[in-house]
Regions:
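Short, surface-exposed acidic
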Residues: 35-38, 222-233
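Residue-level marker of structural boundaries
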Residues: 31, 159-160, 239
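PAPS-dependent sulfotransferase catalytic core
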Residues: 1-99, 164-167, 172-178, 230-247
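PAPS-dependent sulfotransferase catalytic domain
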Residues: 105-228, 246
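Active-site micro-motifs of SAM-dependent methyltransferase domains
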Residues: 28, 33, 149, 208, ...
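Residue-level detector of flexible, active-site-proximal loop/helix-junction positions
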Residues: 40, 147, 205-207, 232, ...
Length: 247
């Protein structure tokens, strides 16, 4: 029966690039992305799974270069694949955000009957080569936002965290560093740009025309949806903020 489980949809992109809004909208048109998720529609255990391995390599989500260098090697890629595969076999449900309650069991059972599913977690952008070995045929939805806007948003969030009393995250108060970080994620995601299973979405275009962009994405993901579902999903996407011309 498990042979009928579809390959997942991986929603990737740099932090603060619109991946949350995109994932929420796709969920509303039928993409199953788990039930035990944080406010950004991410499974916490998947975040930890990724971050623990990043730190093994001397990196972190905000310092991906050591990991990216490691996974380029045959040894590094195979080690990463083994790490992810072992953990998924042990704890598929919790890693992908499913509870051990009747609804969670029902949601997981639907996967065995071909329900479209996937997940959103920005670090997946870095880990995608390994995930696609574990789930051959997986589809990539790569959400891209203007790099300057994404970098500014990362820095602004960091400064808010510090103002609230959180310890500083290395280098994230530096706008130039944030720009380099966004570019590293962008380059990592574009490794798959020549694949038929890759779909790039410019977040500003999604904000400008949610119905058309979401319909295209939903079709790419193999979703079946109603006009009402599409309208509801489109309404969930906030329009871009209009900046004052005096600023």
């Amino acid at each position: 029966m498990k042979d009928r489980q579809r390959p997942p949809v991986l929603i990737i992109g740099a932090h603060r690039s619109g991946t949350t809004a995109t994932a929420r909208a796709l969920e509303l048109v039928g993409l199953q992305i788990g039930q035990r998720l944080d406010s950004h529609r991410e499974p916490r255990l998947l975040q930890k799974l990724h971050e623990d391995y990043l730190r093994r390599t001397g990196g972190a989500w905000y310092n991906p270069q050591p990991f990216l260098k490691w996974i380029e090697s045959v040894e590094g890629k195979q080690d990463c694949i083994s790490y992810l595969r072992l953990n998924v076999r042990r704890d598929f449900a919790r890693i992908f955000g499913y509870r051990f309650n009747p609804k969670g069991l029902w949601l997981r059972a639907r996967l065995n009957f071909g329900r479209p599913w996937g997940w959103k977690e920005p670090r997946t952008t870095l880990f995608a080569p390994a995930w696609l070995e574990i789930f051959p045929g997986g589809r990539i939805v790569h959400v891209i936002r203007d790099p300057r806007a994404a970098a500014s948003s990362i820095r602004e969030r960091e400064l808010k965290f510090q103002a609230a009393g959180d310890p500083p995250t290395p280098n994230l108060a530096d706008l130039n560093y944030c720009r380099q970080l966004v570019q590293a994620y962008l380059t990592a995601g574009e490794r798959f740009a020549n694949s038929a299973n890759y779909q790039r979405v410019q977040f500003e275009e999604l904000q400008a025309n949610p119905p058309a962009m979401l319909e295209r994405l939903a079709n790419f993901c193999g979703l079946r949806f109603t006009t009402r579902q599409l309208a509801g999903a489109a309404a969930s996407v906030r329009p871009a903020r209009v900046k004052s011309t005096s600023s």
